Amino acid sequence: NDIKEIDENTFFAQDTMTLADNEYVLFKESGVYMNVMQRGVGSPLTDGTYYIESRFVEMALQTRNDDIQMEAGDTLTANMHINNPSYWGYPEEFKLTVSGTSYSGTFSGVSQMYDTYEQTSVPTGWLLPLQYLKPSRTNSSEDVARVRLLVPHSAGTVTASRYVYPCYYEITYNLGR
């Protein structure tokens, strides 16, 4: 609720980091707000194909009393316990393809997102942070790349797009395989 918005120029001047818990960069083109909790200890991703393992919590940002019936703050789906980040259930697995500034992803294997939303494509809001993170293969919850996102319907799941609602995410990104 009480976030400090910074613009992209400030974000780049801070070496693509947000400096406070409540500091979020607004990416105007997508409408996504991002707070970098941990950039990761790996290297920036270059052109190629990667297997990414993610843990996430998805929460509603608005109350809806229509077809979807949700309260702001409701957990919509998750595969991570937000108060216990070392809790390890099955990660969300997706194949990421990077080509220049283009990022695309497809969920594979065990997928909570597919089970919940019946979509195989990774939401664009999930892909945007990967341009600025350094994911690695790590078992340390302190070293894994981690962000908080405020995602508008247009960069979210197919259901968020259909019913026009924004979501909050906390997501980790780890290199798989």
Model-assigned labels for residue ranges:
Residues 1-177:
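Cross-family detector of peptidyl-prolyl cis-trans isomerase
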